[in-house]
Amino acid sequence: MIQQMRARRAGVIVNVTSSVTLAPMPLAAAYTASKQAIEGFTGSLAHELGAFGARAKLVEPGYGPTTRFADNLGLSVADMIPEPYADFARPIFEAFANPPMITREGDVAEAVWLAANDPSDRLHYPAGPDAVALAKAG
């Protein structure tokens, strides 16, 4: 695919990561590391493709409880917390039960569309009001 993008001197790759890359968050170290790897890869790729008129972009969605993302695990995230961390984790899970801002599916779709159609060299597209707030704070 990259060979064709170089030959046409056009094209865009949009990778979707997470707002965990915008600010350190507790209880998400491994998940954050996996998303940061994609961010680093995409940032480097953007430089490489840019020399050929193609682009790479990142969409960073916020917390989306309506996506049922955690249901894909097949078990409760709270049940995965080791006992020594239970007291530390409790208020974090309580805060996630009633977040002040969330990301909806439409927020992500809009950010992907914007990233795919933006001819600039902008790399980051936070998706959802919570992700936008984190990006501005960072």
Please tell me what each predicted stretch does.
Residues L123-L134:
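Short-chain dehydrogenase/reductase
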Residues S18:
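Residue(s) in the substrate-gating loop at a strand-loop-helix junction
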Residues Q3, H47-E48:
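Alpha-helical segment proximal to the catalytic Tyr-Lys
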Residues M1-R9:
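A short helix-coil junction within the Rossmann-fold of NAD(P)-dependent oxidoreductases
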Residues A51-R122:
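SDR active-site lid
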Residues S34:
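Active-site helix of classical SDR
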Residues A23-A30:
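Active-site loop immediately N-terminal to the catalytic Tyr-X3-Lys motif
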